[in-house]
Every structure is written in structure tokens, then in C-alpha cells.
């Protein structure tokens, strides 16, 4: 299929669609029994690094739910391992040793995709063959700030105080770290596009922990450089910053065609702020999928009503789908969006 034949691609550019496209963040995951069956015999990192299995898992929600896009099964921390930190899952991710000093930063190296992550590129090539034009394939990576949060903290955190301490006490070291991560993110995502990804999403899961002023100073320059470096491929770029409702104008300044919204942001307000030149993606609260199907349909209708038929809307969750969600509710959501918006 040509790019103009995909509702997902058309929505990213604000072009007419036959119906509102929908896909779900973390749509390949633990809520699907077929995914859990694979995970019974394979550890998470091994799954990410085995192209045949990663491709199989990527395709599961396409077949089971009828989503309008596939997203590469991987993890945002994969490129960090190649930079020189050890990556473990216990079961949450742990990075050792944490990056805390100027010497730690200098010891990091910029990723070389074909050498360091050939499995990611082979998974993309395999998926393009297996999808055979059914739906477009989204590649993805972490935003520089979110990757820095994990690298400095060494694990997930509620407040990321080690990262903020570095940011405020050693701004030159912080800037050098962010430059190295941005350089890695650029070559990593460019390699995904060259391998065949038809859209790219940049996940900034922790960008919302900062004030708008700090986001503008410490995050925006690097996210803008990353997105700018991906613009020559002619594919849609989606920028998702969780918790960014108070600074959507700054998020839009980073570039790309689509701003992802979490569920704490009014879609109607977001569209007013962003204007007609920027598409939006979102933004159902993932926990709604734990409810009855009449509740799911009510919330789908509310979000569609907030969008008011404006072009450039991709329906999605406001964050990743929860492992506890019944698969039939996820399938109902996709069907509901399609049914209510079919032209």
C-alpha cells in the first residue's frame, strides 16, 4: 500500500481518513495470553533481541485487535546498553553502574546501530515483509531526557532526584550527557527509519516531572535536535511527553507532526493550544479498559466529541495498556472507535 492509503499516516498529516485510526501504546504485552505464553519460555531481554520472536509479538495485537498500526516490540533502554551501561530486568529495569560524574559521561560511547543493535533492524525488516502492507509499522525510541533519568538514577524513580541533582549542581556534565544521548538517539532512530519504519514515536515518559521553565531549559533543546535530525525521511514523527498538559506549546516547539496526549490533558484544550497544524494522539485513561464495555464506549464518545471531527486525530491510550486489561475490552475499544467514526 502507498502511504496515502493508510488512515494512520493520513491522520498524522491532518489529511482525510475513512475512519479515526487507533492503536494502543504497549499493545504487544502482558494482557494478551499469546504474549504471556511466549514469555513463559523467554526472558524479556532475550525476546527483544530475537527478531523472529519480537516480530511475532509485534504482530499479535494487529491480528487480535485490528489496530491501524503495528509498533515495534522493543524497549526504550535497549540503546543504553550499547552506550556502556549494563541493563538488567529484576523485573523492573536496572542500569549499572549509574552515570553520576563527568568521568562516567566520558566513558559512554555513541551507539553504532548495525554493530550494536542489529536485532532491532532485522526485526523491522522482518516485520515489513510479514506485514506486507496490511498496516504501517511504527519504530520508536526514548527521548533524551527520559533516557538520562534512567541512566543517572540507575532505575525507575518517583522523583529522579539524582538526575535533578546533576542537572542543577553540574549543568555542564548534564549537558554533555544529554548531547551523547541525543547523538545516540539520532543514529538509532535514523537506522530504524532506514530499515523500514514508516513512522517514529519518541517517548518522553518523564518529561512532565519538570516545570515548564526547566523543561524549556533542560529538555527542549535536545528533543528539538533529535526530531529535527529525523525530518528528512518524510515519515510522521510522534512526540509523547507524559504529564505535559501545562506545557503543550513547548512540546510542539520540539517539532514533529503529532503530539501524544496523556489522559490528564483535555483533548479539546490541547487542540486549541496546538492549532490546526499539529495532529494529536490519545487520550483514553488506560484504566477505563478495566470497566464495562458501556463505560468504554461512553469514554470513547467523549473523546471523539472533544475532537469534534477535526482532522489529525489518532485514537490511543494516554499511556501504556495495563497488564490486567481483558483482551476482549481492548478489541472492543478498537471496534468502537472504528464503528463510531466510519465515514
From Swiss-Prot:
The lineage of its organism: Bacteria, Pseudomonadati, Thermodesulfobacteriota, Desulfuromonadia, Desulfuromonadales. Transmembrane segments: none annotated. Belongs to the uroporphyrinogen decarboxylase family. GO terms for cellular component: cytosol. The record marks 75 as: Transition state stabilizer. One of its GO terms (biological process) is protoporphyrinogen IX biosynthetic process from glutamate. It comes from Syntrophotalea carbinolica (strain DSM 2380 / NBRC 103641 / GraBd1) (Pelobacter carbinolicus). This is Uroporphyrinogen decarboxylase. Pathway: Porphyrin-containing compound metabolism; protoporphyrin-IX biosynthesis; coproporphyrinogen-III from 5-aminolevulinate: step 4/4. Its EC number is 4.1.1.37. Catalyzes the decarboxylation of four acetate groups of uroporphyrinogen-III to yield coproporphyrinogen-III. It is found in: Cytoplasm. Its main location: cytoplasm.
Amino acid at each position: 500500500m502507498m502511504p496515502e492509503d493508510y488512515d494512520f499516516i493520513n491522520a498524522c498529516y491532518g489529511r482525510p481518513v475513512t475512519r479515526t485510526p487507533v492503536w494502543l501504546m504497549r499493545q504487544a504485552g502482558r494482557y494478551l495470553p499469546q504474549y504471556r505464553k511466549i514469555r513463559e519460555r523467554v526472558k524479556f531481554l532475550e525476546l527483544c533481541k530475537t527478531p523472529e520472536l519480537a516480530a511475532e509479538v509485534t504482530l499479535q495485537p494487529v491480528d487480535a485487535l485490528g489496530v491501524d498500526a503495528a509498533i515495534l516490540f522493543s524497549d526504550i533502554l535497549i540503546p543504553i546498553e550499547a552506550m556502556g551501561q549494563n541493563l538488567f530486568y529484576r523485573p523492573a529495569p536496572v542500569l549499572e553502574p549509574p552515570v553520576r560524574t563527568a568521568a562516567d559521561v566520558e566513558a559512554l560511547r555513541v551507539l553504532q546501530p548495525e554493530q550494536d543493535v542489529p536485532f532491532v533492524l532485522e526485526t523491522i525488516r522482518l516485520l515489513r515483509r510479514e506485514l506486507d502492507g496490511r498496516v504501517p509499522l511504527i519504530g520508536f525510541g526514548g527521548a533524551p531526557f527520559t533516557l538520562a533519568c534512567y541512566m543517572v538514577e540507575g532505575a525507575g524513580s518517583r522523583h529522579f532526584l539524582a538526575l535533578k541533582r546533576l542537572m542543577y549542581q553540574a549543568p555542564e556534565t548534564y549537558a554533555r550527557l544529554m548531547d551523547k544521548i541525543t547523538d545516540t538517539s539520532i543514529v538509532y532512530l535514523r537506522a530504524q527509519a532506514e530499515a523500514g519504519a514508516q513512522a517514529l514515536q519518541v517517548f518522553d515518559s518523564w518529561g512532565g516531572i519538570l516545570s515548564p521553565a526547566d523543561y524549556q531549559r533542560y529538555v527542549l533543546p535536545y528533543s528539538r535536535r533529535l526530531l529535527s535530525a529525523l525530518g528528512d525521511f518524510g515519515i510522521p514523527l510522534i512526540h509523547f511527553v507524559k504529564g505535559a498538559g501545562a506545557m503543550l506549546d513547548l512540546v510542539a516547539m520540539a517539532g514533529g507532526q503529532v503530539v501524544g496526549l496523556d489522559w490528564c490533558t483535555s483533548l479539546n484544550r490541547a487542540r486549541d493550544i496546538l492549532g490546526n497544524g499539529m495532529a494529536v494522539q490519545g487520550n483514553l485513561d488506560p484504566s477505563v479498559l478495566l470497566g464495562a464495555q458501556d463505560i468504554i464506549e461512553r469514554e470513547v464518545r467523549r473523546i471523539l466529541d472533544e475532537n469534534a471531527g477535526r482532522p489529525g486525530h489518532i485514537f490511543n491510550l494516554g499511556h501504556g495498556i495495563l497488564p490486567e486489561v481483558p483482551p476482549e475490552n481492548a478489541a472492543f475499544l478498537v471496534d468502537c472507535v472504528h464503528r463510531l467514526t466510519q465515514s
